[in-house]
């Protein structure tokens, strides 16, 4: 048996996900742009946004209809947007608990994703209480060096770029140019482009930034899997949970998702609960 490598659904080698914070009124236009190009993402909302919508902000009706019905995800961003790194653990626990509780009660959904409200996050104490609070992934505010790698530490998920990064479009070109037919690294490793930011950063005549990005990256369904953060997490988790026989001639998929991978230069799809010969 040669090396096995993950493929995104449909045997794609590339995936794109977006992550936007704070739930401001400018999310309206951002969602419209993303939808127009078939791009999906996760919107990280502080709990206070849904418990007491601000005057001049998104209304209760908009909060209910803007995200999930359009195929996007809502994730935890604390309750009051407190930075856990400069908070006592007990305050951090309360902040994340209340933030998750508020979102779940408002949307009537189980919400397990998160974005840290502040700075690069690698603190093990914080990660420990996030696990206890049922958070399965948390996006950090670091990275931004053009990496297309799938995270190993889901509670320190480093993005590819922020939407104000001057190299964002350069990274997009590199991502699109990676050809699995001619590039060994692109053929071996599935690629993930992760863009994050705040929709209010486009408000001063800068909407062209995200419009150009989405126009370039969208509409490539045969090549790119467009997914929310949680969809990425759940799919990779399902792939990593595959069970192989000792001689690598059989594989069992215990998850509820179909999983795609390549081995011996052949493509394999293993359905939910299915055992296949290789």
What annotation goes with each model-predicted range?
Residues 1-28:
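Boundary/entry segment of secreted carbohydrate-active catalytic domains
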Residues 2-8, 51, 104, 137-148, ...:
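C-terminal domain-boundary segment and adjacent tail
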Residues 5, 29-33, 125-129, 209-213:
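A short acidic, amphipathic alpha-helical/loop segment
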Residues 20-23, 78, 199, 229:
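Active-site metal-binding loops of divalent metal-dependent hydrolases
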Residues 35-128, 132-136, 142-161, 191-199:
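Metal-dependent polysaccharide deacetylase catalytic core of the NodB/CE4 family, i.e.
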Residues 89-94, 166-169, 204-207:
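Non-membrane alpha-helical structural segments and their capping/turn regions in soluble enzymes
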Residues 170-186:
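A short, acidic, amphipathic alpha-helical segment used as a generic capping/interface helix at domain edges
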């Amino acid at each position: 048996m040669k090396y096995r490598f993950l493929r995104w659904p449909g045997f794609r080698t590339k995936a794109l996900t977006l992550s936007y914070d704070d739930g401001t009124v400018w999310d309206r236009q951002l969602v419209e742009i993303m939808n127009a190009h078939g791009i999906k993402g996760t919107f990280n909302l502080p709990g206070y946004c849904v418990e007491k919508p601000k005057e001049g902000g998104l209304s209760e009706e908009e909060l209910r209809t803007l995200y999930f019905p359009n195929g996007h995800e809502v994730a935890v961003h604390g309750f009051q947007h407190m930075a856990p790194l400069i908070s006592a653990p007990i305050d951090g626990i309360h902040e994340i608990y209340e933030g998750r509780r508020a979102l779940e009660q408002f949307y009537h959904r189980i919400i397990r994703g998160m974005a840290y409200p502040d700075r690069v996050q690698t603190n093990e104490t914080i990660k420990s209480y996030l696990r206890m609070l049922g958070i399965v992934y948390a996006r950090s505010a670091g990275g931004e060096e053009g990496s297309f790698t799938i995270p190993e530490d889901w509670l320190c998920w480093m993005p590819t770029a922020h939407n104000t990064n001057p190299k964002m479009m350069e990274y997009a070109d590199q991502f699109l140019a990676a050809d699995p037919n001619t590039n060994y690294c692109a053929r071996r490793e599935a690629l993930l482009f992760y863009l994050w930011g705040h929709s209010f950063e486009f408000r001063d005549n800068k909407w062209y930034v995200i419009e150009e990005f989405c126009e370039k990256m969208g509409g490539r369904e045969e090549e790119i899997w467009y997914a929310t953060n949680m969809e990425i997490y759940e799919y990779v988790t399902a792939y990593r949970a595959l069970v192989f026989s000792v001689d690598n001639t059989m594989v069992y998929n215990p998850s509820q998702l179909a999983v795609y991978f390549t081995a011996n230069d052949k493509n394999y799809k293993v359905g939910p609960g299915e055992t296949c010969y290789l």
